[in-house]
């Protein structure tokens, strides 16, 4: 009997570190808005620098082939924006634990793990980390290197046939 490992492909867009961090930042900004509308942030909404962050990310994405220096700069910027927003949400949740819905708390846990992974890869100057998150909406999906000519990396659950 011959066994072969294959993958159940998931339909997700190809994940880049910068796009995952940008998506995380946008979700965090939405959570901060939700908490502020519920009155959990006090009188003044925390600064999210959303316009600057979006401008920085779009400036990076427009580049057809960014060099290594530009990629690291974009990752550093997005990591900073995500870290700031996570800090705001930590203080909001410390004061008012019911400020976010259960679904938002799940996203927050995934974003925390993603931030730690991305920060570790940035600081160690690597592109590999165990149990890497490649989708915020489907955090169980993992990259599987297949070595096929058409697609080198597939995303999904690994199965043995």
PLM regions: where:
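Polybasic low-complexity intrinsically disordered regions
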Residues: 1-160
